[in-house]
A protein has these predicted regions:
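Rossmann-like nucleotide/phosphate-binding core characteristic of flavoprotein oxidoreductases
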Residues: 1-37, 55-59, 249-251, 255-263, ...
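Beta1-alpha1 glycine-rich phosphate/pyrophosphate-binding loop at the start
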Residues: 35-104, 187-213, 220, 228, ...
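Conserved N-terminal Rossmann-fold NAD(P)-binding element of oxidoreductases
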Residues: 40-41, 139, 178-181
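Phosphate-coordination loops involved in phosphoryl transfer and adenosine-cofactor binding
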Residues: 32-36, 109, 173-175, 230, ...
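N-terminal FAD cofactor-binding segment of flavoenzymes
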Residues: 48, 52-60, 141, 154-157, ...
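FAD-site-proximal beta/loop scaffold in flavoenzymes
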Residues: 144, 149, 155-171, 260, ...
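A Rossmann-like FAD-binding core segment of flavoenzymes
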Residues: 92-134, 139, 194-293, 332-339
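Glycine-rich dinucleotide-binding loop and its adjacent helix/turn
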Residues: 10, 14-35, 143-196, 290-292
């Protein structure tokens, strides 16, 4: 499918076309290009790792679907120390501007499709067939929205089921939407959507909201928001064209009801984007890549940083620090002759 929901640009469209129809044969068969460090992922951790590596005078490539990563789906950012207030898009633009001040090969609108360990070298194959080689690989592919995995959800993604309030919220102006999830991301989404939509209904699986009290207080002050706890979403219902309702079960009474609405924003957390690496490096049960205090994985020369790793607290500022740490660890291992 070439359907794109939300924001995009020509580079993303080109990448989709290359994936679906292939690329020029000479490009696919080109000689493997070698680097000192390859960074997979273009979020705060990936960009930080690339900049720190480049500042050491190393040959660096960064392979990313988009610079900014999950940050681009954040409306307001007020906890990035020394930057009192910014937006996800502004931060993503600033990350790219800073990155391009250094001689880094930016390979945007691509994904890492395959990783092979050949001696001390790591060979990377991208989604468009390019191959790259380096002794150090820093995985900073972040995390993705978790899905409900209920009947009807997959069918109506992009047709009423959404995950990014910032991207898709304006499409529901003046309409009734639901937010599934009562953590910080869910309540932030509800607050944001309340300024656009006629009504916002929040459904939380647990018996109480999990969001910070300051967010809950803000939510309670909004007249067009309704909250239901102990509520399980069991089905997404539509008319074949778009979503029309959710089936909700009260976990205390076991009673089910249909809630008619125009859209639902699923905000139940993130899942580590580690699937392509799981046969190479060790992961925990949720799929996060296991790392030590220096961002090293169980494979010499492979490091992980940010939301894809086991580092606690998935925050922008922490991801930036972890990316820097991974780069410094890789450089230290290089100097010591480990990689």
């Amino acid at each position: 499918k070439l359907l794109h929901v939300g924001r995009g640009d020509f580079g993303e469209l080109l990448a989709k076309l290359e994936e679906q129809y292939g690329i020029d044969e000479t490009k696919a068969n080109a000689e493997v290009k070698e680097y000192d460090v390859i960074v997979a992922g273009g979020g705060p951790a990936g960009v930080s790792a690339a900049i720190y590596s480049a500042r050491k005078g190393l040959r660096v490539a960064i392979v990313a679907e988009r610079i900014g990563g999950q940050v681009k789906e954040t409306v307001g950012i007020e906890n990035l120390i020394s930057v009192p207030e910014t937006t996800g898009n502004e931060l993503a633009d600033n990350l790219k501007t800073h990155l391009l001040r250094y001689p880094v090969d930016l390979l945007e609108h691509r994904k890492v499709e395959k990783v092979e360990v050949v001696g001390k070298q790591k060979q990377i194959t991208t989604s468009v067939g390019e191959k790259f080689l380096a002794p150090a690989l820093i995985i900073a592919t972040g995390a993705s929205w978790r899905k409900l995995n209920v009947p009807g959800e997959a069918e109506y993604i992009g047709r009423g089921v959404a995950f990014c309030p910032h991207c898709d919220g304006p499409f529901y102006k003046g309409k009734h939407v639901a937010v599934v999830g009562g953590g910080n991301s869910g309540i932030e989404a509800a607050i944001d959507l309340a300024g656009i939509c006629s009504k916002v209904t929040v459904f939380e699986f647990m018996d109480e909201l999990k969001a910070d009290s300051v967010l809950q207080d803000r939510l309670k002050s909004l007249p067009n928001v309704e909250v239901f706890v102990s509520s399980q979403t069991t089905e997404v219902i539509g008319n074949g064209d778009k979503l029309t309702a959710l089936r909700i079960k009260d976990r205390k009474t076991e009673e089910e009801r249909l809630v008619e609405l125009d859209g639902v924003f699923v905000q139940i957390g993130l899942s580590a984007n580690s699937s392509v690496f799981r046969d190479i490096v060790e992961t925990n049960r949720p799929g996060e890549i296991m790392i030590d205090a220096h961002c090293r994985t169980n494979v010499t020369g492979i490091y992980a940083a940010g939301d894809v790793s086991t580092v606690p607290y998935k925050q922008i500022i922490i991801s930036m620090g972890e990316g820097a740490k991974a780069a410094l660890s890789a450089f230290d291992d290089r100097v010591r002759g480990i990689i």
